[in-house]
């Protein structure tokens, strides 16, 4: 596949400022509003991220851990899930950059990471 840079899809519960800060640093960051998916279910958000080949960023640990298990159990692939604890947007971006600057999109495939 050879995808180098991780592109992110931000779940509805992630502050849109995170996307703005990432874009200012040259990263691709799609919000649920950008994708026209406001108020979509978690499964729909995940399917959208998969379709866009983007890693999903969320604060919703329980539901997205369950979705990751479902994808694994059913042999479905995804482009990664990053679960962030709630912090100010600048802190979330600081933590994200540790992954974005060290992990390729291919390495993120089917991974579940926590920041």
Residue ranges with predicted function:
Residues 31, 56, 83:
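Short catalytic-loop micro-motif centered on adjacent basic/acidic residues
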Residues 28-40:
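Conserved BB-loop
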Residues 42, 48-67:
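Acidic, metal-binding active-site segment of PIN/NYN-like and related structure-specific nucleases
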Residues 1-12, 16-19, 23-24, 37, ...:
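Acidic, PIN/NYN-like endoribonuclease modules and their adjacent C-terminal/linker elements
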């Amino acid at each position: 596949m050879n995808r180098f840079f991780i592109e992110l899809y931000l779940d509805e519960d992630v502050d849109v400022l995170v996307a703005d800060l990432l874009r200012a640093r040259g990263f691709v960051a799609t919000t649920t509003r950008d994708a026209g998916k406001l108020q979509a279910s978690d499964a729909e958000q995940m399917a959208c991220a998969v379709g866009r080949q983007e890693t999903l960023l969320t604060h919703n640990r329980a539901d997205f851990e369950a979705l990751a298990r479902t994808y694994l159990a059913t042999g479905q692939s995804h482009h990664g899930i990053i679960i962030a604890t709630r912090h100010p947007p600048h802190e979330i971006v600081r933590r994200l950059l540790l992954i974005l600057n060290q992990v390729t999109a291919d390495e993120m495939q089917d991974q579940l990471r926590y920041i």
